[in-house]
Amino acid sequence: TDPDIAVDVDHRMEEFEKLVARIHYVGMKVIIDFVPNHVAREYHSICCPAGVTDLGEEDDVNMHFSPRNNFYYCPGQPFVCPVPTPEGEEPYVENPAKCTGNDRFDNRPGVGDWYETVKLNYGVDYCDAGGRSYHYDPVPSTWTKMTDILLYWASKNIDGFRCDMAEMVPHQFWSYATRIVKGRHPQMVFIGEVYDTEQYRTYVRSGFDYLYDKVGMYDCVRDIICNRRPASSITYYWQNVSDIKEHMLYFLENHDEQRIASDFFCGDGRKAVPGMMVSALMGCNPFMVYAGQEFGELGMDAEGFSGCDGRTTIFDYWCVDTLRRGHYDRRLLTQEEKRLQAIYQQVLCMANSERAFCEGDFFDLMYVNPQSQSFNPRCHYAFLRKKDKEVILVVVNFSEEANHVGVTIPGHAFDYFKMPERDVEAVDLLTDERTTFNLKKDGVVEMDLPPYSGRIFKFSIQMEDKTYELNAHNKEEFPPAHTAEHLLNQVMVRMFGCERSKNAHIERKKSKISYVLDHKPTRQEEKAIADKMNELIAEDLPVTFEFVDRDHIPEGVKIDRLPEDASETIRLVRIGDFDVCPCIGKHVRSTSQIGRFELLGTNWDGLTHSFRIRFKVIP
């Protein structure tokens, strides 16, 4: 663990263990970076457990290669640094030179090499007279030491390893190490950074759960966003790995790649929204979001080591602008940044909650939708997902212009998904818009596509015509006050441990709402209620909707207050990550549209322990 970010350096491991526990407590998992190919040139452990020998401690430095060594050496040759020693500092001395991390096997790495790192020796002699040779029997020293390191961190109750440059380490080691680690920690996840697509299957067989699909899907989608290749090319890249698609990790940003909104990519985070929708929704495999991507982080700072290169520095202590504003004072975010985050939140939530996305089958529609007046495969991409009786049609638009499109659904899709030919009512999960589709084999479904976005239409193929009939609402509520009611319910649940209100009258001029509490709130607690409400309103949390059936209600969501004749399809209203509740009423799009929350007064009934709040919102 990094002593620079410890509160108490001597107890930093205890701090790490407590951090892991806190992360697990809020329902998240911990994946740590494991760098198996190289270490820092000056590496040495300062806290080896008793009986453990450090990397290189027992090496024979007079041998360029030995399967018993942990490093490679240049016997009799000192290390020659490719950059000058800063004024006032002592020159770095290393004799004999260790070989450099990016497979540079002499003592004079260039400025473009990884000269600050040294290559670990896994039993491969890269400079054998007859070419590369392999020495895996007996098991090389580095294999056992690196496996012990994995086991040590696995014992800290983490959930997985992201393995840096995994393909620079022989797959035979990974088979050895993952078998041992997963034997003791069966749920441990291994994520590998592999760039050679021809090696994907080898590393999957070696125990990796997921592989970065950089050279495949990332490069493809990036080029589509930048208008360098057609959207229809997506088909080739998923088909190329169709047998291992569930092992592909999709992404549009990571620490090695340029930021989407940077001048080096496309200059605008919005342009990647259709690519994000495709990457997150077309398969059951994971999609990774890099911190700040959801706000459209520019990555255009000229940091000390890396300079202005469109990436967020990984070498310097630095303040990332959107993260500072987005996570510490949302009032400083621009409206465009808030809108972009809301889209990411919507799509990622449905990717994890809609069974058709996280469990369902996939059908690519591009082969029956060539260039036509109503469809342009250069900027449009369409596919279906299905689970049981739920079908979702996703159509995205990489263009800067709004388009009216017609999407052909072939007879084969009807046969594959066992879909009936009939009218269905569909709802757009992004906008809550409802429409009717006439489903026919080889028929066309028409829709309007906004620029740099898409439509996500969900419908049921049950033969009975229930589809998305929701119960009629018994009153026309004032949306700002109605959303405030949801927000207030969660505030009271968290502050007082009570149930959500069962008695509320929500109106435009003023509203009343009651809670059963174990004590009468003090004046300070009443003030805290109002303060918390206005704090949440100022955070401008997005208000989003999703549709689920009764058998797939998310954990923690109660539907016991719905009427007995409530429909099978339930609409959930989410307010950021703060609240989720079944509801069919009208709401604002984000909490800032509520306006100011004003607590008008309270009443306490000591006999029933009922606490009534009178409030109004001032948009």
Give short role names for the model-derived ranges.
Residues T1-M13, T117-T142, I158-M168, Y218-I225, ...:
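The substrate-binding groove and active-site-proximal loops of carbohydrate-active enzymes
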Residues T1-N121, E167-E198:
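Acidic/aromatic-lined carbohydrate-recognition and catalytic surfaces
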Residues V30-I32, F161, F190-G192, Y250, ...:
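Hydrophobic faces of well-ordered beta-strands that scaffold small-molecule active sites
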Residues H38, C47-D54, N62, R68-N69, ...:
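Active-site-proximal helices and loops of the catalytic beta/alpha 8
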Residues D137-A154, A272-M276:
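Short, acidic/polar
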Residues E253-N254, R259-D423:
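Loop/helix patches that line or flank the sugar-binding groove of alpha-linked glycan CAZymes
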Residues F437-M463:
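C-terminal beta-strand-rich structural cap/linker in extracellular carbohydrate-active enzymes
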Residues M463-P619:
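Active-/binding-site microenvironments in catalytic and ligand-binding cores
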